[in-house]
Amino acid sequence: VKWGIADFIHTFGHTPKGMWLPETAVDLETLTVLAENGIAFTILAPWQAQTRGLNWNHPYNVRLPGGKKITIFFYNDAISSSISFSPNATTNADQFIDIYLKDRFNGDGSDELVIAASDGELYGHHQPFRDKFLAYLLDGALSETGIQTTYPARWLQEHAVEQEIEIREKTSWSCFHGVTRWSDVCG
């Protein structure tokens, strides 16, 4: 965590507000270490919440030992899986918005957040020209829809997070069996 923070400061010139956990592998000890090092949030998969029936378009706080807390954002599984595993989903940004984004909001005018998570190497390495898809999506196609782009640190500056949840200990995004893929045979 300290190395990640130091690298972020070296690269971007300021301390990070959040941190992506590798494979979103998480437990309370890890969240506590993040909070103790000034990290305010991380992003997890929806199935990493112990609490059920949540609105994934809003972040939640997790109470940590010692009276600390950390905010958890959840990525949208359907959108993220389509981006990562369905090459046709990311060929046309306008169609992507129509198929994957427009129906994700409740339409009542309240602020909602839809997070897509994918591996960075997807854009241009695994899928040729997906970097251009992403650039047009963010800098062109979305501007005509009323959907605004943001990022978690900015969201936290503009919105209070009041609800608390519990996480499922020792889980990750990439394995429904938890984190045993790194210490044992998965499954």
Task: List each language-model region with its residue ranges.
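Active-site and substrate-binding clefts of carbohydrate-active enzymes
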Residues: 57-80, 87-91, 95-187
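Gly/Pro-rich turn-and-neighbor structural signature
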Residues: 1-70, 111-112, 117-118, 124-128
